[in-house]
Amino acid sequence: ELPASAPIIDVDPDAAGPSSQVTSPTDLKLFTAANPWTKNVKALTKSSSSDSIINWLSSAGGWGGGTMKIDFGIHVLNADASTPKKSFTPTSEFYTPDCDNVPFPVPSGGAVEGESGYQCTMDGDCHLIVVNKGENKLYEMWRANISGSTFKGGCAVVWDLAKQYPANLRGEGCTSADAGGFPIAAML
């Protein structure tokens, strides 16, 4: 479970972040139902093409900043019933009807991906990811930007953590905050 004393779970614990309290991403324990991203894969046989894919990615510069890594300074925030929710103005990256326009929990002291706060200053993905275990929901938004009292955001998705999603996840044609149809936090 998410520790009540740690409002921020930092997937990049080496980066300067908004909180000194860091919890491992393995402590998230998202999605109670049997979904693909909750399956323990340690005992599975490695794909015969795995090494060649990793070698190709490494020789091509890896992901992002030229390094093979799974973290990019993504903060997974913890919300509870007292966390205020804010409505946002959709940007041109909000795709109706595939995205959810619902108020988002905005925990105090949090940050969007790649930033030390809620303002998206670097023109990056600026994902806002919030887990509310009391609601059993995962909120994810792409290109979130809160500047003063103005909150704008691209595609936003709310995942039901207790739901057993079908093979097409949120449904044919639906997207997600990562544009691939998958929950970001569950795959960190």
What are the roles of these predicted feature ranges?
Residues I9, G17-L188:
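Short, surface-exposed polybasic-aromatic patches that bind anionic ligands, especially phosphate groups
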Residues A4-P7:
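N-terminal low-complexity segments that are often proline-rich with Ser/Thr-Pro
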